[in-house]
């Protein structure tokens, strides 16, 4: 992040102007760092709220925040941790899960006990087999890695043919990755997978990437950043219609007709939404990263009924219910109070939910969750479905680079377009696709590059 010591923009006759499109974590992080450097910043957000794909709900469980979007934070997410410390946000570590009591459902068969404990262990061995390739990857610029083009040309499915382990272990590993990376394995770049593993610290990627939740809800970080930026610099309900880069100053036109001029424009909205933007000169296709599909189903139950059967709420399947865990912060004080069983599905599993009506989704949830956690349908009280690909200003889960895109698209995103349009967000963060860290980190890094471009500040390396 940018250091406090800086050459103030006041030394310039006129401070540079930057318009940032999107008030998700990427946009807010970039705006906050640029404001500290003395840049005149305007953040435009189409929605009536801050946070983008981070949305903390307080209506499902009493006195708790439940995440309808991005949820888990890693010990290997330095920007998130730095902001949490700076703004006084408490992070709670998730309890360890006992593999023997965390069900896996594969090929229609529910596994428990010693069989599932052995499968969890074997699954881990399969995943760790990619670490050797990941150690060769340049974390900041994976397209410069040895054999980058060849690794990028491979799909994850092709690379998986070299995995060790039994067929069942490989199937479980692929189910986990397909959900986590919201990807279809045959359409997901192997280099993108390796870049994520490398960015997370190789071995640490598997053990430290999803271990914390924010006690006050992840959206509290968005609010903290917004307060630091200043309310006057953020405009909600302000969708952008066009970006014109042909003159000396960039011009951003809102749907309302308002026109803003800027020395630079930062686009943080996901690439899946760019069809709604008219960019002049037109943005080449090689700037657009592929995105995947992800959904969440938040199920309020009358109490954590699974404990009576000595089950953990963490599960993995090869069906529509991709993965489950217990949601809600702060942690429960009583075993009798209502709880949230969260379903997360990515890739093909997510599509199964999106293709159904609300009534069909409820039926699907009851059917599959009753298999994993017998009695679920008797205990469920409320269900909230969040289909991010159906949300107007999102249209996706998160980035899922196709074969060839890491070496082709990422260098272009890092370089910008027409020397005026720049990019930040998880889609522009090769080490943290799909994570909040991707937005926060890419926003802060871009702010540093722009500050140097404007001759404003030095950069403090995290």
Regions from the language model: what does each represent?
Residues 1-462:
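FAD-dinucleotide binding site
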């Amino acid at each position: 992040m940018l250091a406090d010591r800086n050459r103030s923009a006041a030394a310039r006759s006129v401070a540079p102007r930057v318009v940032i499109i999107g008030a998700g974590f990427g946009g807010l992080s970039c705006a906050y760092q640029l404001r500290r450097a003395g840049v005149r910043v305007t953040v435009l957000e189409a929605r009536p709220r801050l946070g983008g794909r981070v949305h903390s709900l307080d209506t499902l469980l009493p006195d708790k925040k439940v995440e309808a979007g991005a949820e888990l934070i890693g010990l290997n997410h330095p920007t998130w941790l730095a902001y949490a410390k700076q703004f006084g946000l408490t992070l709670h570590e998730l309890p360890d899960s006992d593999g023997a009591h965390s069900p896996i459902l594969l090929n229609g068969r529910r596994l428990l006990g010693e069989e599932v404990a052995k499968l969890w262990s074997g699954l881990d061995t399969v995943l760790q087999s990619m670490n050797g390739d990941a150690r060769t990857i340049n974390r900041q610029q994976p397209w410069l890695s040895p054999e980058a083009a060849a690794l990028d040309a491979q799909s994850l499915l092709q690379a998986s043919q070299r995995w060790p382990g039994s067929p069942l272990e490989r199937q479980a590993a692929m189910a986990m990755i397909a959900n986590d990376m919201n990807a279809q394995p045959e359409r997901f770049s192997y280099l993108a997978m390796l870049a994520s593993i490398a960015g997370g610290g190789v071995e640490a990627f598997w053990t430290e990437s999803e271990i914390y939740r924010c006690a006050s809800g992840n959206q509290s970080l968005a609010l903290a950043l917004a307060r630091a930026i200043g309310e006057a610099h953020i405009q909600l309900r302000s969708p952008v219609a066009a970006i014109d880069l042909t003159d000396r100053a960039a011009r951003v036109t809102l749907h309302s007709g308002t026109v803003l001029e800027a020395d630079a424009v930062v686009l943080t909205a996901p690439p899946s939404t760019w069809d709604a933007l008219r960019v002049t000169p037109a943005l080449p296709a090689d700037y657009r990263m592929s995105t995947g599909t992800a959904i969440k189903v938040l199920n309020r139950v009358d109490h954590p009924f699974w404990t009576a059967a000595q089950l953990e709420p963490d599960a993995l399947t090869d069906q529509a219910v991709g993965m489950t865990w217990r949601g809600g912060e702060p942690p429960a004080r009583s075993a009798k109070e209502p709880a949230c069983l969260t379903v997360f599905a990515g890739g093909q599993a997510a599509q199964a939910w999106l293709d159904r009506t609300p009534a069909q989704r409820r039926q699907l949830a009851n059917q599959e969750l009753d298999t994993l956690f017998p009695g679920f349908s008797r205990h469920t009280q409320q269900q909230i479905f969040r289909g991010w690909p159906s949300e107007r200003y999102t249209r996706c889960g998160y980035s899922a680079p196709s074969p060839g895109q890491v070496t082709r698209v990422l260098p272009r995103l890092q370089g910008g377009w027409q020397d005026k349009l720049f990019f930040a967000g998880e889609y522009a963060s090769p080490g943290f696709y799909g994570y909040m860290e991707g937005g926060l980190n890419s926003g802060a890094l871009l702010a540093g590059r722009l500050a140097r471009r404007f001759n404003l500040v030095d950069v403090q390396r995290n």
